[in-house]
Amino acid sequence: PDPCCAEGTCECEEGKCKAGCKCTSCRCSPCEKCTSECECKSKEECAKNCTKPCSCCP
């Protein structure tokens, strides 16, 4: 799991930023299956929004 923020003030929870996090650019574990098996707008969007493989895809 990657840290959400460089400052280390963010925590990841279920693939996205933990509730109450005061981060503007939060990034948690990327959903590689989502970007490879589904169509997403961007890898960055998947990394921010995916909680399970492909769950960020429409």
From Swiss-Prot:
A divalent metal cation 2 binds at C5, C10, C23, C26. Coiled coil: none annotated. A divalent metal cation 1 binds at C4, C5, C17, C21. A divalent metal cation 4 binds at C31, C34, C50, C54. Keywords: Cadmium, Metal-binding, Metal-thiolate cluster. A divalent metal cation 3 binds at C12, C17, C26, C28. InterPro entries: Metalthion_crustacean (IPR002045), Metalthion_dom_sf (IPR017854). Residues 1-29 are annotated as: Beta. GO terms for molecular function: metal ion binding. Induction: By cadmium. A divalent metal cation 6 binds at C40, C46, C50, C57. Residues 30-58 are annotated as: Alpha. Metallothioneins have a high content of cysteine residues that bind various heavy metals. Class I MTS in crustacea are involved in the sequestration of elevated levels of heavy-metal ions. Belongs to the metallothionein superfamily. Type 3 family. This is Metallothionein.
